Amino acid sequence: MREASEEAARECRRFRAEHRFGLVYVFGMTRALRLAGVEIPRIDLSAHPRLSEQRMQLVVRNKNLEPRVRAQDANHMLAVYVWDAPMDFACLGDDLIFTSPICTWAMLARFLSLEELIVLGDSILRRNTVHRQYSQADFKNYLIALRAVKGRRAPRGIVKCERALTLMRPGTDSSRETKLRLCIVQHGLPMPMINHRIRAINGNVYYLDLAYPDAKIAIEYDGMFHSGQWLHDSDRRNAIEASGWVFIQVTKTSLSDHSHRLMLVRRIAHELEMRTGIHYFVDAQTPLAELVKRR
């Protein structure tokens, strides 16, 4: 993601050199995510074309500035957004200002599904990031600040943000892992641990994508790797299984449709029952909007 951040920075500097609006540039939305090195969530661009990564998004505080900026957009590649709520900033170098990842997350809430808002939040909370490390408390504090402004309604999407936060978790490595975790809990299974650390029988330390430590069940998302990576992962899996763990491998196909997802959660439920004696009913899938209300 660092390369994407650097490329976005070059594009922003080039754009700024070609457009003189007489105001401080604050880049936002998907442009801000690219500058921060955050994975772009899935957006319905047919409904929200201005959020395309090809557009240059700017954020202004005062709606009166919007026409002034748009008037100079001869190529129609600029998208201007008004955000009069408390704004948080980040910088790249000493010349590029953009909305911070958490602020951008809140701004995008009204354009994203609840699932994609959770996925974006997890992306910001990942272990290895280009931007500074954030915690769930940072998200909570920003939402409190948005609610605390007297005499002004909270921005659209804040309720969705508050709900998304209940299912966001730090330390993930990919959006696929987040969607896997959400699939598991939507089908009535317990929330698994993320990046659980174990020392295998061979003495090596491994971090499991998702795990139920008490039942010694490891759930790993397997992407497409070259042969050398496959051999390494095979040795890793053998060591984990030799240490008494059940290893459940998940692929892109496992999450591709309802029947595959059901097959996966039934397998996890079976292993949990075999190791804990607890039976889980997993055939029904609870919508995320309903799930967050119960938490």
How does the language model describe each region?
Residues 135-295:
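Surface segments flanking catalytic/ligand-binding clefts of nucleic-acid enzymes
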